[in-house]
């Protein structure tokens, strides 16, 4: 009987160490997504300034610029693709607050865990699986804009799709780890 108690204690210690290590991994993921999200947030300023220049050039001087218009589009796409995981981390994505807002910490953790494992992660895995060949084809031909004076870097824009999915999946893993750790302590 004492042997089983020792074994149970050892398993509990190993389990605690594993969650400690997993929480450290979640912390690293959080730092990565936070740094990328904060850096990408500056693209909002770039988008606003470039759009302002475009409007002034068009309506005051009658000038248009395809490459500047595409730069605004690319910066806008990069802003959303690179900041989405950070938005997930800080709880900025839309959710049904009717149930979630009044739920206990345990229930919220359970919802977060199930949502990450059965909704977010499978969808991101499929998106990565489909987006990598899509981006690779674009890189293989160094795809450029269909407009003559457009940007010659469509392949970079398409690379943001699997990168977005990877960052979201990583942040989903971090959320699942934190939720599982919270559920384990209850």
Language-model-derived ranges and their functions:
Residues 3-186:
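Alpha-helical transmembrane segments and membrane-interface helix-loop junctions
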């Amino acid at each position: 009987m004492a042997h089983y108690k020792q074994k149970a204690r050892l398993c509990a210690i190993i389990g605690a160490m594993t969650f400690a290590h997993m929480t450290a991994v979640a912390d690293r993921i959080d730092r990565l997504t936070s740094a990328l999200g904060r850096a990408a947030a500056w693209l909002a300023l770039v988008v606003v300034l470039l759009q302002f220049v475009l409007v002034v050039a068009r309506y005051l001087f009658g000038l248009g610029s395809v490459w500047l218009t595409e730069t605004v589009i690319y910066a806008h796409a990069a802003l959303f693709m690179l900041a989405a995981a950070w938005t997930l981390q800080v709880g900025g994505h839309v959710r049904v607050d009717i149930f979630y807002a009044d739920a206990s910490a345990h229930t919220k953790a359970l919802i977060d865990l199930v949502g990450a494992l059965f909704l977010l992660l499978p969808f991101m895995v499929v998106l990565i699986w489909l987006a990598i060949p899509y981006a690779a084809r674009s890189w293989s031909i160094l795809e450029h804009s269909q407009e003559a004076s457009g940007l010659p870097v469509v392949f970079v824009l398409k690379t943001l799709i699997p990168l977005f999915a990877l960052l979201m999946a990583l942040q989903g893993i971090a959320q699942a780890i934190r939720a599982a750790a919270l559920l384990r302590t209850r």
